[in-house]
A protein has these predicted regions:
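Subset of outer-membrane beta-barrel
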Residues: 1-177
Length: 177
């Protein structure tokens, strides 16, 4: 990405941008499945000559209203699930054709008010993680750029029971443009 969305896709891409920019997106997510699910993104970046580029983004995903049932399939009411995350980004050129970037992220997930079945507690989590990115301009061909990112690096995500924690969905991505 060569705009404020770079903090999401590959923070290393921020290094090649000048000035400042604000970006916003709203998407009705999976509208054929449910009409109350949506995704929102707000991103910002500003370059500082000889220092690099800072930026960040906020993400909100509303998973809509859901029906709560107990372990005997008895109706218990309705609830709404949502997730939000914020990231602070920094990117710097290594030289004229290479750059690196880093995101520090904090996320909050609200899946349900209470535990399910015999579980006690709330179905929420607060977690942190990091993304790292690298970009190489003119890789193999003058007009071919290479991007590499590793996202969601951090500790396990735990809701009610830390013994049932799950790893963050860490991804290694390669891209060409």
């Amino acid at each position: 990405a060569n705009d404020a969305y770079a903090s999401y896709w590959n923070p290393a891409g921020l290094a090649y941008q000048e000035g400042s920019e604000l970006a916003f997106m709203h998407v009705n997510w999976l509208p054929n499945l449910a009409d109350d699910m949506y995704y929102e993104f707000l991103g910002y970046r500003k370059s500082f000559p000889n220092l690099g580029t800072i930026g960040g983004h906020l993400i909100y995903l509303n998973l809509g209203e859901q029906v709560r049932m107990d372990e005997y399939a008895q109706y218990q009411g309705k609830f709404t699930s949502y997730m939000m995350a914020g990231a602070i980004s920094y990117s710097q050129k290594i030289n004229e054709t290479s750059s690196f970037g880093l995101n520090a992220k904090l996320s909050y997930q609200h899946l349900v008010e209470l535990g399910t079945g015999s579980e006690k507690g709330k179905g929420t989590s607060i977690d942190f993680g990091f993304d790292v990115g690298y970009m190489k301009k003119g890789w193999l061909l003058p007009t071919l750029d290479l991007g590499i990112t590793m996202t969601n690096i951090g500790p396990k995500v735990s809701f009610i029971d830390p013994d049932q924690a799950d790893p963050q969905p860490t991804n290694l991505t390669f891209g060409f443009a």
